[in-house]
Amino acid sequence: MIRVIAICILAAIGLIAPARADMSAEAALASVAPFYKALNAEFAKDSPDLVRQATAPDWVSCRGNDLCNTRDEVIAGIGQRLKSIPDLRWEIKEVLVAGNQVTIRGEATGTPAGEFMGAPYTGKSFKLMSIDVHTLEDGKMVRSYHIEDWMGAVRQISAK
């Protein structure tokens, strides 16, 4: 009981930081938009700079709880992906904000230029959904968790 009263007193006199207010969806979108632009084939030559613009130097991108890549590794991976899918287009479909966390529902479309994730070349295109959760500090992405339906894309290009 004394602990509860002490916390209330500290909060009342301003010694406990207030909860961080949510940033606006517009501010969140402005912070992450360069990263999503970097995922588009149209901007392939600018992709590394766009990723750097949106991310902190120590940013990590995680495809699992402990499967994370550094910014430089992600930049290299995006370059490879843009070569294998030369018409890749990634669109932001929805932006949700909670504190300094930004969740993006995205959609990617493209046509692989050759064998793709073990699937033989068919000339078919795919459309997939992605969900990304980004933590922002000072307007930069510092940590991201992402999931894309690449197996759904493989099924689409492999369908008879």
Whereabouts are the PLM-identified features?
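A short, structured loop/turn motif at beta-sheet edges
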Residues: 95-103, 135-141
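Short, low-complexity N-terminal intrinsically disordered segments enriched in polar/charged residues
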Residues: 17-57, 159-160
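A short hydrophobic beta-strand element
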Residues: 100-112
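Exposed beta-sheet edge and beta->alpha loop/turn motif
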Residues: 110-137
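Positively charged n-region of N-terminal signal peptides that target proteins for export
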Residues: 1-4
